[in-house]
UniProtKB/Swiss-Prot annotation:
Family affiliation: Belongs to the YqgF nuclease family.
Function: Could be a nuclease involved in processing of the 5'-end of pre-16S rRNA.
Major site of localization recorded for this protein: cytoplasm
Species annotation: Legionella pneumophila subsp. pneumophila (strain Philadelphia 1 / ATCC 33152 / DSM 7513)
Protein name: Putative pre-16S rRNA nuclease
Gene Ontology terms describing biological process: rRNA 5'-end processing
Gene Ontology MF: a single term: nuclease activity
Subcellular location: Cytoplasm
GO cellular component labels: cytosol
Name of one Pfam family that matches: RuvX
Annotated keywords: Cytoplasm, Hydrolase, Nuclease, Ribosome biogenesis
Stored Gene3D superfamilies: YqgF/RNase H-like domain
InterPro entries: RNaseH-like_sf (IPR012337), YqgF (IPR005227), YqgF/RNaseH-like_dom (IPR006641), YqgF/RNaseH-like_dom_sf (IPR037027)
Amino acid sequence: MPRGVYLGFDFGYKRIGVAVGQRLTCSASPLSTIEAKAGIPDWNTIQKVITQWNPQALIVGLPTCIDDRELYTTSAARRFAKQLHKRFSLPVHLVDERLSTVEARGYLFEQGGYRQIKKAEVDSIAACVILEQWLQQSE
């Protein structure tokens, strides 16, 4: 697996969390949250992020239930991943994002209680969790 920069996405109908990470340290950092309207991403903003970071690949969280059933957002996340590949000609990898939002909320709670839990931050930290999981699994 080439060393370099990778972008992680936590797809949602209202917001898409974005994180940036690197293979060398298998770590990621929350980057931003991109607004979506009725599940339609802001492709201009996504293009700016991709142009700025020039990633080796894009990682998209795939929402599923604990018992492996697919959620209503699973097909939308798959569609988003396919659109990313088609628009930007980059490899796109899907990662089981089970409990990534719960983990992100827990992290924010540890940082300062309920006052620290902001939806936009949860999404970008969830993207960070997704990306770090992929980086560690693909070593």
